[in-house]
């Protein structure tokens, strides 16, 4: 099993690479790529960690050597948020990066499962889809927007509020991956009751958690470490499913039936071909239904921007 981390010299990429070096199954190959010349050194550094995962780093303009033979590609390349920026501000730089990487993937590893971390995910995933379609290699089961950070934040914040073990909390998060498009289904958390005020406050905090970190870092970065953990959780789930483990379920932003939007985050059953089944997100509370209805214009607009960009 070969996993490629693209954007591996950045804050998310280095955290993700460290976690994968420690947690990938024995015998896995980990390839790191970044345009930055430090990348082979990041791989050398990580290679000293005594785990049965081989690691190699590649730098320069061409990601092809890292992508060759990859089963899973995790893309965190791009610029990070700074104070005053929202995810849409990132679009101008990151859209072009994702487009060119998708073009390389289409040629080099067209059957790989691709997980996109690069923001704005609502828009970068449709860009990648359009590029892969143009190349004639698109398989919607193999393209994911990684929204796991919204899930782990939800689990953490609920556990803190209710004094529970975060490992016991499961919160499905649907919609998209920015602002109002992030919808945690707090009505479905088992063994926990919330007041209306708690639901409103928690939902807002989860939606704005990225900004919370950007501001706390005072211009020194964005949510890199927690995102690395979230991407590792999703990447490992994908690896397990590809290797035949049953009942692997994670929320992800995928192309579905298009009931609400062409791409939508919801629980996905992962399997040997990627997304084996897109699962129902179940019954919504009135609060959640209203939040869903009011986000759809934003989400569909984000998707349309990506489709137009890739034309």
Curated annotation (Swiss-Prot):
Pfam families: Ldh_1_C, Ldh_1_N
Residues that, per the record, bind substrate: 81, 87, 119, 153
CDD domains: MDH_glyoxysomal_mitochondrial
Top-level EC class: oxidoreductase
Catalytic function, reaction form: (S)-malate + NAD(+) = oxaloacetate + NADH + H(+)
Gene: mdh
Subunit-level organization: Homodimer.
GO BP, sorted A to Z: malate metabolic process; tricarboxylic acid cycle
A GO CC annotation given for this chain: cytoplasm
Protein function: Catalyzes the reversible oxidation of malate to oxaloacetate.
Origin: domain of life: Bacteria
Annotated family: Belongs to the LDH/MDH superfamily. MDH type 1 family.
Lineage start: Bacteria, Pseudomonadati, Pseudomonadota, Gammaproteobacteria, Vibrionales
UniProt GO MF annotations: L-malate dehydrogenase (NAD+) activity
Entry keyword set: NAD, Oxidoreductase, Tricarboxylic acid cycle
UniProt binding sites for NAD(+): 7-13, 34, 94, 117-119, 227
Entry annotation: catalytic residues: 177 (proton acceptor)
Name by which UniProt lists this protein: Malate dehydrogenase
InterPro entries to which the protein is assigned, alphabetical: L-lactate/malate_DH, Lactate/malate_DH_C, Lactate/malate_DH_N, Lactate_DH/Glyco_Ohase_4_C, Malate_DH_AS, Malate_DH_type1, Malate_DH_type1_bac, NAD(P)-bd_dom_sf
EC number: 1.1.1.37
